[in-house]
Structure formats: C-alpha cells, structure tokens
Amino acid sequence: MLVILAFIIVFHIVSTALLFISTIDNAWWVGDGFSADIWRVCTNSTNCTEINDLSSTEEFSGYSVMQAVQATMILSTILSCISFLIFLLQLFRLKQGERFVLTAIIQLMSCLCVMIGASVYTDRRQDLHHQNSQLYYLLQEGSYGYSFILAWVAFAFTFISGLMYMILRKRK
C-alpha cells in the first residue's frame, strides 16, 4: 500500500510541476531565434514584448483569447495544488474504505482547464499570428514548443491522476 501511495503522490507532484512549467515558461510557439507563449513574444533572448502591455484592441487583436488561455492554465495549476492538499487532508481524515472523491473531482476540473486552455491556443494560434502580424512577423515559420507539449502531457497526467483518485480507497 505504501508503494501505491508513494506512486500516486509522485505522479500528482509531477503533473503539477508540468502544469507550472507549461504555464510559466516561454515556449508555446518556437522557431529559429524566437519564442512566444501565453505571456510574451521574444524575437531574440533580449527583445521580449509582454502581451499584457499590448492589451488595447488596436495594438493586440485577440487579447481576450490569450487571457482565456492564461486564465485556464493558471486555474488548472491552482486546482491541481488544491487537490493535492485536499488529498493529504483526506489521507488522515477519511474513514477506512472511503474514496477520495473530492480530490478526484478537483483534479478532473484541473484536467478540464488544461484541456480548454491548450485547445483554445491550438485553435486560435494561427488567427492570432495573422491578426497581429506586426508582433508575430518572425513567428510564422515555427512549431509548437515544449511548453505546449508539456501542457498536453499535463492534461493526460491530471486525467489519469483524477481517475486514480476516483478508484482509490483508503486502507490501513
């Protein structure tokens, strides 16, 4: 039982770490000498433009889309942290034989938020780049970066983690 418990804890910590990295790091769209994410666009290592600074509609078209991605990724990270804390509390407070349902529900909500954020970015990325060509002029020839991929991996991890919590019962 201790091995299963250790595995679940490590799995949850890894999925939360993936959420933090994918939300914070600047590599959702990368290419030769540039990178862009949900927070900023960098044409080289020293020339970065914060998207939040360009929030007026005439400067950055589609800002609400980026805000939606930012909000869902932040919310998924927060929910994953909360579900881990609730899991630790339930570990000591639940009666023997009960399931970790609250932890599972919150972890699955985190999974849903990651899916929404990554899906919105996937769907709207090309439109954002074309509508804001003055900012993304170098970024047309690029590919999805490791932060974007980590967001999808975190989606899978949080989904599996949520299912594990749903199935798991407290034992001695």
UniProtKB/Swiss-Prot annotation:
Q: Which PROSITE patterns match?
A: PMP22_1 (PS01221), PMP22_2 (PS01222)
Keyword annotations for this protein? Cell membrane, Cytoplasm, Golgi apparatus, Membrane, Nucleus, Transmembrane, Transmembrane helix
Name the major location: Golgi
GO CC annotations, alphabetized? apical part of cell; apical plasma membrane; cell surface; cytoplasm; cytoplasmic vesicle; Golgi apparatus; Golgi membrane; membrane raft
Q: According to its UniProt record, in which tissues is this protein expressed?
A: Expressed in glomeruli.
Which InterPro entries does the UniProt entry name for this protein?
Answer: EMP-2 (IPR003933), PMP-22/EMP/MP20-like (IPR050579), PMP22/EMP/MP20/Claudin (IPR004031), PMP22_EMP_MP20 (IPR004032)
Molecular functions (GO terms): integrin binding; kinase binding
Annotated membrane topology is: Multi-pass membrane protein
- Superkingdom: Eukaryota
Protein's GO biological process: actin filament organization; actin-mediated cell contraction; apoptotic process; bleb assembly; blood vessel endothelial cell migration; cell adhesion; cell-matrix adhesion; early endosome to late endosome transport
Which compartments is it annotated to reside in? Golgi apparatus membrane; Cell membrane; Apical cell membrane; Membrane raft
Q: Where are the transmembrane segments?
A: 1-21, 72-92, 100-120, 148-168
Is Nucleus among the key words of this record? Answer: yes
The record's note on quaternary structure and interaction partners says: Interacts with PTK2; regulates PTK2 activation and localization. Interacts with ITGB3; regulates the levels of the heterodimer ITGA5-ITGB3 integrin surface expression. Interacts with P2RX7 (via C-terminus). Interacts with ITGB1; the interaction may be direct or indirect and ITGB1 has a heterodimer form.
Q: Can you tell me which family this protein belongs to? A: Belongs to the PMP-22/EMP/MP20 family.
Q: What is this protein for, i.e. what is its function?
A: Functions as a key regulator of cell membrane composition by regulating protein surface expression. Also, plays a role in regulation of processes including cell migration, cell proliferation, cell contraction and cell adhesion. Regulates transepithelial migration of neutrophils into the alveolar lumen, potentially via mediation of cell surface expression of adhesion markers and lipid raft formation. Negatively regulates caveolae formation by reducing CAV1 expression and CAV1 amount by increasing lysosomal degradation.
Name the record gives this protein: Epithelial membrane protein 2
What species is given as this protein's source?
Answer: Rattus norvegicus
